[in-house]
Swiss-Prot record:
Keyword Manganese listed: no
Cellular localisation: Cell membrane
Domain of life: Eukaryota
Molecular-function annotations in GO: adrenomedullin binding; adrenomedullin receptor activity; coreceptor activity
Positions bearing the site annotation: Required for CALCRL interaction: 139
Chain ranges on the Cytoplasmic side, renumbered to this chain: 166-175
GO cellular component, one term: clathrin-coated pit
Extracellular side: 43-143
InterPro entries membership: RAMP, RAMP_sf
Disulfide bonds, paired cysteine numbers: 68-99, 84-131
Subunit structure: Heterodimer of CALCRL and RAMP2; the interaction forms the receptor complex for adrenomedullin/ADM. Heterodimer of CALCR and RAMP2; interaction forms the AMYR2 receptor complex for calcitonin/CALC and amylin/IAPP.
Descriptive protein name: Receptor activity-modifying protein 2
Summary of the tissues where the protein is detected: Strongly expressed in lung, breast, immune system and fetal tissues.
């Protein structure tokens, strides 16, 4: 049966990082980011005079984005107290993103684009600025449990040392 391992096929094996991904892939991604830096990953909107701007495409997209924003605000305003609860806001947030993406495709603009990014950032600043991850606070166990956890290994160590020494003397006597 043929093995699927790279070494058997004769190809070079890529060195792996701690997380298991090939180091060459990570270096390639890093090189791409360094050689081609962008302020944002968004695709730029066409300006007037470019082929994609005939008929005021960008202006129409801005109007459509305003519709998406107003619809999102109408959905979010009644939820006011639960803005940090993902179960409550996931639907309006997803609807906003889908709306922005739909109109970007409709007007032959890339997504994400600067206007869509600005809307997303704005909603984060308005609705989610005061949200933080709730992390449980850890406390020490009760004192009796803590003492048991400390004393048990301390008592076991001399017993285990005695057992090892005793067994090693037995093996020396047999040899």
């Amino acid at each position: 049966m043929a093995s699927l391992r790279v070494e058997r096929a004769g190809g070079p094996r890529l060195p792996r990082t701690r997380v298991g991904r090939p180091a060459a892939l990570r270096l390639l991604l890093l090189l791409g980011a360094v050689l081609n830096p962008h302020e944002a990953l968004a695709q730029p909107l066409p300006t007037t005079g470019t082929p994609g701007s005939e008929g005021g495409t960008v202006k129409n997209y801005e109007t459509a984005v305003q519709f998406c924003w107003n619809h999102y605000k109408d959905q979010m305003d009644p939820i006011e107290k639960d803005w940090c609860d993902w179960a409550m806001i996931s639907r309006p947030y997803s609807t906003l993103r889908d709306c922005l993406e739909h109109f970007a495709e409709l007007f032959d603009l890339g997504f994400p684009n600067p206007l869509a990014e600005r809307i997303i950032f704005e909603t984060h600043q308005i609705h989610f600025a005061n949200c933080s991850l709730v992390q449980p606070t850890f406390s020490d166990p009760p004192e009796d449990v803590l003492l048991a956890m400390i004393i048990a290994p301390i008592c076991l160590i001399p017993f285990l040392i005695t057992l090892v020494v005793w067994r090693s003397k037995d093996s020396e006597a047999q040899a």
